[in-house]
From Swiss-Prot:
It comes from Borrelia turicatae (strain 91E135). This is Elongation factor P. It comes from the Bacteria. Pathway: Protein biosynthesis; polypeptide chain elongation. Belongs to the elongation factor P family. Keywords: Cytoplasm, Elongation factor, Protein biosynthesis. GO terms for biological process: peptide biosynthetic process. Involved in peptide bond synthesis. Stimulates efficient translation and peptide-bond synthesis on native or reconstituted 70S ribosomes in vitro. Probably functions indirectly by altering the affinity of the ribosome for aminoacyl-tRNA, thus increasing their reactivity as acceptors for peptidyl transferase. GO terms for cellular component: cytoplasm.
Length: 192
C-alpha cells in the first residue's frame, strides 16, 4: 500500500478511505484561483455498497490499496453464489453476490466458461472486471416495422443471459452482437 496525491487519483482506483476499501466511480478536478485545486470524488464502499462524495484539496494524500487481479473462469451460479475456478491453481471458490458491492449490474454479462478478472484485496474478492465489450447471442427480438427508419430506430432484443438491450432494426434472432459492458448498450454486430 502506498499514498497517492489527490490530483493523481483516476476513475477505477482502489483506495483505503476511512479504514474501508473504496473504488473511485467519478473524479472531477477543479483549479481555483489562489485557493489551489480541489478534487471531487464519488466513491463506492466495497463492503457496505454505500456511495459517498468527498472533496479533497490538491495537496491531500490518500492511501491507495494494492489489489491482486486473478484470472478466473466462471463456472455457474448457485443461488446467491457465483462459482469460479482459479486458472493457476484450478481451485474452485464461490463469490457471494451480497458481499461484493458492484457485482449485481455485472452478473448479466457473465457467461459460463468465460474468463474474467477478479480483483482481490486482503485475500477477499472485492470486484469483478469485465471486458469492455461482451459478445451475446440474440434469443428474442421485436419485429421491425418496414419503413420505420426516419430516425436512428432501435428495438428491444433479449440476449441469451436474459439481458435486454436496444439494438438496430436489422438485428434478428440468432445474430451475435457486442454489448458495451459499462453502458449496457449495443456496440456492434459480430462479423462471422
Amino acid at each position: 500500500m502506498g499514498t497517492i496525491k489527490s490530483g493523481d487519483i483516476e476513475k477505477g482506483t482502489f483506495l483505503l478511505f476511512k479504514g474501508m476499501p473504496h473504488i473511485v466511480l467519478e473524479r472531477e478536478f477543479s483549479k481555483m484561483g489562489r485557493g489551489g485545486s480541489i478534487v471531487r470524488l464519488k466513491l463506492k464502499n466495497l463492503k457496505n455498497k454505500s456511495v459517498v462524495k468527498e472533496t479533497l484539496k490538491g495537496a491531500d494524500t490518500v492511501e491507495e490499496i494494492e489489489v491482486l487481479e486473478v484470472a478466473s473462469q466462471y463456472l455457474y451460479r448457485e443461488n446467491e453464489n457465483l462459482i469460479f475456478m482459479d486458472l493457476e491453481t484450478y481451485d474452485q471458490f464461490d463469490v457471494n453476490l451480497r458481499e461484493i458491492s458492484n457485482i449485481e449490474d455485472k452478473v448479466m454479462f457473465l457467461q459460463e466458461a468465460g474468463i474474467y478478472s477478479l480483483v482481490k484485496w486482503d485475500n477477499e474478492v472485492i470486484d469483478l472486471r469485465l471486458p469492455p465489450k461482451v459478445a451475446f447471442e440474440v434469443v428474442d427480438a421485436e419485429i421491425a416495422v418496414k419503413g420505420d427508419t426516419v430516425t436512428n430506430a432501435m428495438k428491444n432484443v433479449t440476449l441469451h443471459t436474459g439481458l435486454v438491450v436496444k439494438a438496430p432494426l436489422f438485428i434478428n434472432v440468432g445474430d451475435k452482437i457486442l454489448v458495451n459492458s459499462e453502458t449496457k448498450e449495443y456496440a456492434e454486430r459480430v462479423k462471422e
